[in-house]
């Protein structure tokens, strides 16, 4: 939304002159960051506040692959930040794709909510600006998060929705994009036994 001499919901004053003057450059940056999400994260990361954190090279490659390709598969050992990278990649796809409905399917039902909340809290700790991409719910003032016993959902200001569910849930069947966090433990993945 463009307001003359007014503040928009992300805390930035945006005028018609600014859109006319800088719109082309902003569009180019958004296109670049949509393909290089790791560069966007570097641009918004506060190195003074969070000196000990930097994406590892394989995380940057994975984020770029998630942003560009329809099908991506990684095989990685324990401790390689697979879940963190998947949740971060999903969040960024929703940021750069207005109206996207994305679903992340986790293997274990009991830990879906706890893991999702933990990973998104970690993401917001490293990149606090990302939390401003979420809607504020009118009913309780929470920052764009809906939780239930079997799903965790983030609602974005650009009308994207990111839902984290367990493999046993019927939610997420009509999404634009589905990510399987752990395909090894899921029966009949890709039409054959795992």
Where is each model-derived feature located?
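Phosphate/NTP-binding elements of NTP-utilizing enzymes
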Residues: 1-194
């Amino acid at each position: 939304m463009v307001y003359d001499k007014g503040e928009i919901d992300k805390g930035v004053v945006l005028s018609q002159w600014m859109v006319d003057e800088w719109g082309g450059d902003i569009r180019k940056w958004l296109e670049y960051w949509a393909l290089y999400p790791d560069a966007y994260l570097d641009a918004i990361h506060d190195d003074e506040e969070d000196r000990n954190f930097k994406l590892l090279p394989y995380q940057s490659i994975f984020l770029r692959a998630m942003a560009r390709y329809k099908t991506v598969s990684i095989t990685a050992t324990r401790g390689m930040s697979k879940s963190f990278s998947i949740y971060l990649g999903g969040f960024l796809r929703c940021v750069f794709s207005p109206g996207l409905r994305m679903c992340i399917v986790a293997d274990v039902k009991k830990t879906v909510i706890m893991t999702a909340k933990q990973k998104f809290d970690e993401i917001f700790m490293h990149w606090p600006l990302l939390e401003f991409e979420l809607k504020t719910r009118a009913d309780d003032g929470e920052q764009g998060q809906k939780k239930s016993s079997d799903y965790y959902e983030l609602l974005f200001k650009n009308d994207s929705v990111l839902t984290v569910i367990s493999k046993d849930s019927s939610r997420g069947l009509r999404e634009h994009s589905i990510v399987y966090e752990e395909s090894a433990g899921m029966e009949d993945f890709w039409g054959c036994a795992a």
